Amino acid sequence: MGQPEILRATPAQSGALTALMHASSAYQGDYASILDGYVVTPGYVETHPTFTATTGGELLGFYALLEDPPELDILFVADAAQGLGLGARLVGHMLGEARARGITRVRVVSHPPALPFYLRMGARRTGTIPPNPPKVRWERPELRFDVPTG
């Protein structure tokens, strides 16, 4: 696999972004309900800075950054691309985008199994989000990235 290219997503990619999310093994079983009916729309991609990681035209991952208030809303890496450092590259890119937009802190409400990843990336845990049934029946870690200034 070559070095993935990280580029701004286009609204035309919204279907592929949705498919990548729904194919994630991290959201099967008990966690499947959170994605039930969830669609990344063309309007979402137009409104929020959304970036894809691709290699040879293959979508390997993406993230979306909300600006007001600042939050890493979505971060997914295809199952086959996990463990290769792509998640770290996407987080680094997101922090660069946040800095370029004058954002100093980025909130993350994490999928519970992803908590160790975010801590390794430098996020600090700030709290716990309670369950919100019926879609979210579990507590979720809340974290924050302090955006480097340099």
PLM feature spans:
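Glycine-rich ATP-binding loop(s) of histidine-kinase-like ATPases
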Residues: 82
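Conserved GNAT acetyl-CoA-binding A-motif
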Residues: 98-111
